[in-house]
């Protein structure tokens, strides 16, 4: 009896296309970035960072937090010195491969601008209507449904996660 593990970053390939190829005999396991606690453990810090007492410990945790929010929490990043190159490579692969090429998008400016505006608005709610208006203000003719589709492609590719407003 053999066990074969197939890994990849493309959510659609793993969930939709592989299903027919493997005849339904597969398990999808999503691996997410570290939580801050996991990140500290991976960087050889105390597990219970809330109990740090010394000024040095507080400074170390603050430094780790700054790294966490600046570079993210991919498990591989703990071992990589040039984090920006690694992250840019992931971005280019996901952006160009999983979003632009796979979905046959010709207006990549709109996708870049949507992603930029979402990143700039990370601390406050942002609606599809607002994103559409921002794009229109730059002279880009795009409909709300297209914006919704583009954000969906980004979500499918795990480039971003959305939170729904249920109020």
PLM features per residue range, with description:
Residues 7, 39, 69-72, 154:
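Conserved RecA-like P-loop NTPase ATPase core
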Residues 31-53:
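Conserved small helical "lid"/interfacial subdomain of P-loop NTPases
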Residues 79-167:
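Accessory nucleic acid-recognition modules appended to NTPase machines
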Residues 3-9, 30:
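Structural recognition of the conserved hydrophobic beta-strand(s) that form the central parallel beta-sheet
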Residues 12-28, 40-45:
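Short regulatory helix/loop adjacent to the ATP-binding pocket of P-loop NTPases
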Residues 51-95:
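Amphipathic alpha-helical "lid/sensor" segments that cap RecA-like P-loop NTPase cores
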Residues 10-14, 33-37, 167:
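Conserved nucleotide-binding/hydrolysis micro-motifs of P-loop NTPases
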């Amino acid at each position: 009896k053999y066990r074969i593990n197939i890994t990849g970053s493309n959510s659609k390939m793993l969930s939709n296309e592989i299903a027919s190829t493997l005849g339904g005999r597969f398990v999808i396991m999503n691996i997410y970035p570290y939580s801050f606690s996991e990140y500290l453990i991976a960087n050889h810090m105390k597990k219970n960072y809330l109990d740090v007492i010394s000024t040095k410990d507080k400074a170390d945790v603050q430094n780790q937090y700054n790294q966490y929010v600046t570079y993210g929490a991919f498990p591989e990043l703990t071992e990589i010195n040039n984090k920006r190159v690694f992250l840019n490579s992931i971005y280019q692969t996901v952006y160009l491969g999983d979003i632009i090429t796979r979905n046959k998008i010709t207006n990549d400016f709109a996708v870049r601008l949507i992603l930029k505006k979402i990143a700039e608005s990370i601390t406050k709610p942002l609606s599809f209507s607002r994103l559409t208006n921002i794009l229109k203000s730059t002279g880009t003719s795009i409909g709300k449904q297209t914006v919704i589709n583009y954000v969906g492609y980004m979500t499918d590719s795990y480039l971003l996660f959305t939170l729904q407003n249920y109020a």
